[in-house]
Curated annotation (Swiss-Prot):
GO terms for molecular function: RNA binding. The keyword Heme does not apply. CDD domains: RRM_SF3B14 (cd12241). This is Splicing factor 3B subunit 6-like protein. InterPro entries: Nucleotide-bd_a/b_plait_sf, RBD_domain_sf, RRM_dom, RRT5_SRSF_SR, SF3B6_RRM. Keywords: mRNA processing, mRNA splicing, Nucleus, RNA-binding. GO terms for cellular component: U2 snRNP. Residues 12-87 form the RRM domain. It holds the Pfam family RRM_1. Necessary for the splicing of pre-mRNA. PANTHER family: RNA RECOGNITION MOTIF RRM DOMAIN CONTAINING PROTEIN (PTHR23003).
Length: 115
């Protein structure tokens, strides 16, 4: 079993990372639709979410097959990172992100950096 599927609760929603910023929804449907009917694809469209997407399959078996086949797949010169969506992990990641932004702001103030 690929590393991306170990210790994850299998479900019909996949979280994709390391996507090209130029990818279109049509290209996503073409790629992920090879493994079964896709109900929805949500591409990240903010600075923090660019290069990520959620792919919702009609059934779990199709999501599992896509996760196994596409994790590490080279697409548009980038290796895809595919995980099953885990809402508990998303909450933790969001908290970590807020803390990292706060720490970054402190460093920027300390050194007088303005971006």
């Amino acid at each position: 079993m690929p590393p991306s599927t170990v210790n994850q609760e299998v479900n019909s929603i996949l979280f994709i990372k390391n996507l090209s910023f130029k990818i279109t929804a049509e290209e996503m449907y073409d790629l992920f639709g090879r493994y079964g009917p896709v109900r929805q694809i949500r591409l990240g469209n903010t600075v923090q979410t660019r290069g990520t997407a959620f792919v919702v399959y009609e059934n779990v078996q199709d999501a599992r097959r896509a996760c196994e086949k596409l994790s590490g797949y080279n697409f548009m010169d980038r290796y895809l990172v595919v995980h099953y969506y885990n809402p508990e992990r998303a909450k933790v990641d969001g908290q970590d992100l807020a803390a990292r932004y706060a720490a970054l702001e402190q460093v920027k103030q300390k050194y007088g950096v303005q971006l």
